[in-house]
């Protein structure tokens, strides 16, 4: 749901509003590393291990656009850094609250829920 709301599943991967599927701003990316991941070397090593070996050193923010595993890990770390518990995967309103808290403070819950209902909910329907 967050990827759908942030970038329409990739329609806006690299914009002024952030990089990748989760539209992570460069400053937030840097702050996450400096203020959260750096405090836990084991966790930082696991997340860093998801990034490209050489490309990360020359363009760490580009990794958010070209590496889905790394981008998803960073998005999850952004949520984890707020000490927020993940809700049930089929609870769009609870996910919307996380989205607004972590990714889009100005976002409207109903917009997230509408996006979730249009793009994620169909995946839960029986075939």
Residue spans of the language-model regions?
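Acidic helix/loop microenvironments that form the catalytic cleft of cell-wall polysaccharide enzymes
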Residues: 3-7, 87-109
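Peptidoglycan-targeting cell-wall enzymes and recognition modules
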Residues: 4-83
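Short, charged low-complexity intrinsically disordered segments located at boundaries
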Residues: 9-13, 31-33, 102-114
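Short, amphipathic alpha-helical segments
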Residues: 65-73, 89-93, 110
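Long, charge-rich low-complexity segments
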Residues: 113-127
